[in-house]
From Swiss-Prot:
Residues 396-407, 673-697, 714-725 have a biased composition (Basic and acidic residues). Expressed predominantly in the brain. Also detected, although at much lower levels, in the heart and the liver. Within the brain, expressed in the cerebral cortex, hippocampus, cerebellum and brainstem. This is Centrosomal protein of 104 kDa. Keywords: Cell projection, Coiled coil, Cytoplasm, Cytoskeleton, Repeat. The gene is Cep104. Residues 307-333, 348-419, 673-741, 880-922 are annotated as: Disordered. Residues 307-318 have a biased composition (Low complexity). It comes from Rattus norvegicus.
Amino acid sequence: MPHKIGFVVVSSSGHEDGFSARELMIHAPTVSGWRSPKFCQFPQEIVLQMVERCRIRKLQLLAHQYMISSKVEFYISESLPEYLVPYQAERFRRLGYVSLCDNEKTGCKARELKSVYVDAVGQFLKLIFHQTTNKYNVNQVALVAINIIGDPADLGDESNTTCREKLIDHYLGHSPHNPEDPALDGTFAGRSDYISPLDDLAFDMYQDPEVAQIIRRLDERKREAAKKERYDHAKKLKQAIADLQKVGERLGRYEVEKRRAVEKEDYDLAKEKKQQMARYRAQVYEQLELHGLLQGEPEMQRPFALPLQPLASPSSPQHWKAVSSLPRTEELAAEDTCAGPILQEKPLASSPRHSAVDRSPPAAGPAPRSHVEALPYDERPLPVTRKQLEEPSAEPEVREADSDVRRRGVSAEPEPLTEKALREASSAIDTLGEALVAGAYSKMWSCREDALLALYKRLMEMPVGTQKEDLKNMLRASVFLIRRAIKDIVTSVFQASLKLLKMIITQYIPKHKLGKLDTTYCVERAIPLLLARTGDSSARLRVMALNFIQEMALFKEVRSLQLIPSYLVQPLKTNASVHLAMSQVDLLARLLRDLGTEGSGFTVDNVMKFAVSALEHRVYEVRETAVRIILDMYRQHPALTLEHLPPDDSTTRRNLLYKAIFEGFAKIDGRPTEAEGKTQKRVVTKEAEKQKKEETKALQGLSAAPRETQAGVQEKENEAVKLKNQDPQGRKAAPPDTPEIPDNHYLDNLCIFCGERNESFTEEGLDLHYWKHCLMLTRCDHCRQVVEISSLTEHLLTECDKRDGFGKCPRCSEAVPKEELPRHIKTKECNPAKSEKVANRCPLCHENFAPGEEAWKVHLMGSAGCTMNLRKTHILCKAPAPQQGKGPMASKSGTSAPKVGSKIPTPKGGLSKSSSRTHTRR
């Protein structure tokens, strides 16, 4: 029968420090596997030597989440090739290859488990890895684990076994293809090609190594019991194996979380996880002993420790020796008829956090072993490696061991109370009876749930005329059991406790007219435990606790007491879990909106003290919610809120949280924010500069008007005389105001960006034009550099001195400050950009328009174009459209206004000469 084959790593083409190929010899939740060197040459290869010559049936590869080889080739050989052993020239024989998923659909957050079915005989296996490319990795490949499943290549024994099985089937009249007796089903473990789920790679990679060895031993005992026809005991062992698989998964997650905490140097959390594992392991082993499932196991200490040894090297004398099995004892004489779950989980003091896993192991099935007295080589316990998973894959949350669906077999009575339980619950026993309390203390969750439902029914049926003392005793006993059930990790038990607590507060107390002291007693005894459950690792339990606390705070019986707000405004503890801190601040924000600050227990003082302290929390979500709380308080009490905050100055605004808070205040008040204020200030400054420049030019024009007028009159008289003498009809006269510009002087007095030509455009004049007036240019508000508007976005992202403070929005493709980028992307209010071939994108008005260079001029300079180009209005008012593209006379026409206002009269000849020039041009 195929089973797991042990192997050692003979050679590899290289590895990164801390990720040797020898890591592949270990299967455990915390292994890191092999990684090729960085910037390595491809292909990379690994050679494995199996413990014996065998027939390989199945190969399993667990790939890395992003260091993924595009193709893995497999080669097999009976002995080492020539380049490894010089005196043997045999080469590897190629089996084929497999392609691995590029993992883009999951965002490189999951690992692929690839299974390959082969049929090849040999002792050496070579794997060749080819290069891959994704956005996270371009020069490295990795393999987390590899599993080889096969059987010894002794064909004679195999054929004999097959013939013997066929002979037995023949005499029994049983065909494996059409079985009649399920006990003799050939598709079950008796098949020669059957592969046990316990040999699957997924089983070892997500199971605690100690628990995995216990599961394998229980599986052997289960098959032994089935052979002896002790079916009740086999059924009990099967249920224990199923429960232990969930226990092993949880312990494996705890181990990964502990290693991750050590990696982050969070030693308090690591110590907490270690203690949590020890308590949980001791609890599980105690239940196994209680049910007689650890009989035959070696003596254990708490926590249980199995000898975990690494695989021996091929040269070691112990390499080919089998590991002796643990001593076995007789099975239990009495058979248990209970078919319910064997292991019942108890609440722990500290809740575990969610762990990321890649795949849940399959349900354990029977896996027969040919050896009873000795474990084969490949079943040797594997050690827990000291390497930490540096890139744990993000996978969906693992479900808790208990399900909401009842797994009831034959109804079972709760076990008797222990001495400790009798002392602890003595008052509740006196009031409710030992049977009900025993059910609430039972190790079977169905009994615990039934006890709470029975108590619910009893309280509902209490008659109205009952004495007050009896009613109060019943209430206190019920609260005692509710407190215990609130800490239960089983969802249905937790729900039953919430249902019972709600009924007591809203129905039982009002019905029997008990006082506020009794309501206060219920709330004060339950609320601390409920708040603790809001930090639970299970998202479902966490949400249930949050919603119930919010609902309970709104009960009219509880709201008047103002108790719950006093718990929520307590400062966050520095060592509190992330979920607990997030839940507390979220619950405070919810209730603050529902209850307000008038007679609710919330005051401006206690809420603001809590929110300001939460601004310093290490978790971003907590700080973000604290900002939202402060803004909500400012809407209701602006003056009192400001008293708890530092002054609004440049020093305070260096903190991005306070900057966001004060800008939020400005929006609430309708005032411009800091950015809007700077923009308005720049606009006012530009308008003032524009007005000052116009006044200066007007004064210069007035002072130059007499000289220009006199020179113009003389020039026009000379031209009139010349035209009269040469050609009275004016056909050969060339117009003096449109001189032809030579090619070598075409760029003189011309702005190459907007196309305007002006005599004032000397070297200094052009600089002034670029700096203040050109419609195609703008000044960067961050580095004061003059850039083209069409390239402003690229400038902010790549050239600007403040480019590190900007990021590119994937939706609109514009540069956005990094502190505003998450909100900008989340709101999706920006206008989506189109490709450059389809449209241009204006960074001023954020609109898309026609593509091409000329379209930029139309958009930025046209009257119907960009509405956010602040230079447009000034330039258009100063220089009308016909002025662009003309010769030097265009600049003269611009100074005609001062001439009209001059005291020197305009000569009459000027008008006739102008008309004659017009006629000549025609």
